[in-house]
Amino acid sequence: MTELGMMLLSRVRIALRVGLPALQRRLPDPWDVHPDSRDASQGANLAVLFYEIFLNQTAEGLELTTADALGRYFVLGIPSRHRRTEETAFMVFRIFTAHPTGENPFGWNRIAAGRTTVHANIVRSHTVEANNLEAMVSDRIEAHLDKGVVALELRYRRGVPKRVASEGRVRFTAESEHVRVYRADELVDVVKSVPAAVDRLEGFGLRVTLPELTDIFDGSEQVVNLTVQPWFLRRVYAPSGG
């Protein structure tokens, strides 16, 4: 495997349960929807993620432009499994990015160009109200496009995060033959988990008005898990030939 570089970021991850047909038709053959089996998000079949990138660095240490070194974007993806090989991967089908030219995220240069990632005007308001060791966090994030908006609003009591090491495989539905391997060292604060009976969420709203996503966000979606990752160090790798 070839190391492409690293990313230092924070992330909000919302795991949802939505209608299966709308997801399956977005996957290339021979991939199938494979709901999350992890304890905190068991049964979820869609993830909506917001990334705040503090720094991207190439493996060679090359200096990147501001637009490439920093970033804000929403990612929509489906936990999936290959029908024949049984490989599991997170299949990304749409990214809304603040990058001025709508470039793919770091590590995906020229892959599925123009078919997965689109530019959006992304605004964020993040506040913390702290009293001794207690903290209440309010976060509002919006991605504005010509045809609609993705708007996320949450208010929660901050918990004590766990430090976790993880590894996962990511593909784009538009060119699923390419794969990236992400190895991460992260802090994980599970704010809400239906399977684990955790709920420190004081307020929540997710509004998606884009026509291309109305078959997914039809009002029947259910939140299974909401996790905040205030610190996330990810190394990005490309397998040989990937």
Description of each model-found segment:
Residues 48, 76-78, 154:
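Hydrophobic beta-strand residues in large extracellular and virion-surface proteins
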Residues 53-140:
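Aromatic- and glycine-enriched beta-alpha-beta binding-site module
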